[in-house]
């Protein structure tokens, strides 16, 4: 009987071997779990688990899951424990902090941010309709366009929050809020956002695993991209050819203009995913939501009196959303980067190294949607944004205690740092001594004689 109840052990080296399809193991709090079959139904998708299999994932599990998720692990338990199980001082303090926040009820107390934002979005939508349908001046139409851009920004924050935690009274209403704020109002699939955003959170600033840094041929935040890295997220080579070299060489000049048209790329990414062979949760609902957007938006634009006004309406609305695209890049482009998969053993350290906070007064929190506290958000993605400011000093102290970076700077300083990062890579891209992969189309267009 004693033998039956005796614990079974494997080492971390043994655990690493279970990282292939059909044999996927992870460890949480020293207990080993087999997620080979369960990965197909994981609410957060398979990518995040595949990036961490064969290792301890305790910190990531704590960050992304509510307390109710722990009981789901029971039926996945292999019976094995990790013999050489150790917890670093950083992880110990992080877990203690997460437990304290949970005791204080911070994860459950969501405040009224969602209600206020939804009301604000509804008011702006009515304002846009009034400006287009009831006004005749060009100026009023441009104000409506700018208002629409601001609406898209705020609506994206609702979609972002609802993807991390339940912002409504139940999960069904939460899903409705996702589809409304993402697909119907902005034309960007919430399924696409969750697919890429979860991967970004887990592999923060990994050049080959984080999709938010993979913008070849337009941008390269590091010279490591010059060796044509393979994207482990998109499963394709990020070829640094003559076209990429040319574009990257001037990226510090093209950065802001490209941001003005960032939405077009998101539209394209949405359709690429929805028409792909990938398993897409709620594909039909995502299609329906996108159809709603591409019904009301062109119809609204068509109500303007002539084509020049229609063009400038679209241009202005897209340009306003550049503020949000810039914010996304300010949080990461100039932070530390690395090549390789994320690791569970230094999860906190990687989040601290890969993020930059934007300092602002509290009355501007609505504008940034909580993302100005980027490190706090990455450490506690389920924490409602109304609490991010109050936990910021605690996070800062923890970083100071363990000699980890805590970068917080003004909007202007972050812009300067980002441009300098792009400029540094741009100048190195111009070095003809660095070999590049030949682009046959480019070569043909530039052949003389």
UniProtKB/Swiss-Prot annotation:
Main location: endoplasmic reticulum
Any one annotated GO CC term: endoplasmic reticulum membrane
Recorded phenotype for the gene knockout or disruption: No visible phenotype under normal growth conditions, but mutant plants have strongly reduced levels of unsaturated LCB sphingolipids in all organs and show enhanced sensitivity to prolonged low-temperature exposure.
Database matches in InterPro entries: Cyt_B5-like_heme/steroid-bd, Cyt_B5-like_heme/steroid_sf, FA_desaturase_dom, Fatty_acid_desaturase
CDD domains assigned: Delta6-FADS-like (cd03506)
Catalytic activity: an N-acyl-(4R)-4-hydroxysphinganine + 2 Fe(II)-[cytochrome b5] + O2 + 2 H(+) = a (4R,8E)-4-hydroxysphingenine ceramide + 2 Fe(III)-[cytochrome b5] + 2 H2O; an N-acyl-(4R)-4-hydroxysphinganine + 2 Fe(II)-[cytochrome b5] + O2 + 2 H(+) = a (4R,8Z)-4-hydroxysphing-8-enine ceramide + 2 Fe(III)-[cytochrome b5] + 2 H2O
Motif Histidine box-2 positions after renumbering to this chain: 197-201
Matching Pfam families: Cyt-b5 (PF00173), FA_desaturase (PF00487)
Enzyme class, spelled out: oxidoreductase
Function recorded in the entry: Plays a major role as delta(8)-fatty-acid desaturase which introduces a double bond at the 8-position in the long-chain base (LCB) of ceramides with or without a hydroxy group at the 4-position. The enzyme produces both the 8E and 8Z isomers (in a 4:1 ratio). This structural modification contributes to the quantitative partitioning of ceramides between the two major sphingolipid classes, glucosylceramides and glycosylinositolphosphoryl ceramides.
Domain remarks: The histidine box domains may contain the active site and/or be involved in metal ion binding.
Protein name from the UniProt record: Delta(8)-fatty-acid desaturase 1
């Amino acid at each position: 009987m004693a033998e039956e109840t005796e614990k079974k052990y494997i080492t971390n080296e043994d655990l690493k071997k279970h990282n292939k399809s059909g044999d996927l193991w992870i460890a949480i709090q020293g207990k080993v779990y087999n997620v080979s079959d369960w990965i197909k139904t994981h609410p957060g998708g398979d990518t995040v688990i595949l990036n961490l299999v064969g290792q301890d994932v305790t910190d990531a599990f704590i960050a992304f899951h509510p307390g109710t998720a722990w009981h789901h692990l029971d039926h996945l338990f292999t019976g094995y424990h990790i013999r050489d199980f150790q917890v670093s001082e950083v992880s110990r303090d992080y877990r203690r902090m997460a437990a304290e926040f949970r005791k204080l009820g911070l994860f459950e107390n969501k405040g009224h941010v969602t209600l206020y934002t939804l009301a604000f979005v509804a008011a702006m939508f009515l304002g846009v309709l009034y400006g287009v349908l009831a006004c005749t001046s060009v100026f009023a139409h441009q104000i409506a366009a700018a208002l629409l851009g601001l609406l898209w920004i705020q609506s994206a924050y609702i979609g972002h929050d609802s993807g991390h935690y339940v912002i409504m009274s139940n999960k069904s209403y939460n899903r409705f809020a996702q589809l409304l704020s993402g697909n119907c109002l902005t034309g960007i699939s919430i399924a696409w956002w969750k697919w890429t955003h979860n991967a970004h959170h887990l592999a923060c600033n990994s050049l080959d695993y984080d999709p938010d840094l993979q913008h070849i041929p337009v941008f390269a935040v590091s010279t490591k991209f010059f060796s044509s890295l393979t994207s482990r997220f998109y499963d394709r080579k990020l070829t640094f050819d003559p076209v990429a070299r040319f574009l990257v060489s001037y990226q510090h000049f093209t950065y802001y203009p490209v941001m003005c048209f960032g939405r077009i790329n998101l539209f394209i990414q949405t359709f690429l995913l929805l028409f792909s062979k990938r398993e897409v949760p709620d594909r039909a609902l995502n299609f329906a939501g996108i159809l709603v957007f591409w019904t009301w938006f062109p119809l609204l634009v068509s109500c303007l009196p002539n084509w020049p006004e229609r063009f400038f309406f679209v241009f202005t609305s897209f340009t306003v959303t550049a503020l949000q695209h810039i914010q996304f890049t300010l949080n990461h482009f100039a932070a530390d980067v690395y090549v390789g998969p994320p690791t569970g053993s230094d999860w906190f350290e990687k989040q601290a190294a890969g993020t930059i906070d934007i300092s602002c007064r509290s009355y501007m929190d609505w504008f940034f949607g909580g993302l100005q506290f980027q490190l706090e958000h990455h450490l506690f993605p389920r924490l409602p944004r109304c609490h991010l400011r109050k936990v910021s000093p605690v996070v800062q102290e923890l970083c100071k205690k363990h000699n980890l970076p805590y970068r917080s700077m003004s909007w202007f300083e972050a812009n300067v740092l980002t441009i300098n990062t792009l400029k540094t890579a741009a100048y190195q891209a111009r070095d003809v001594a660095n070999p590049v992969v030949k682009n046959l189309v480019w070569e043909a267009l530039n052949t003389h004689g």
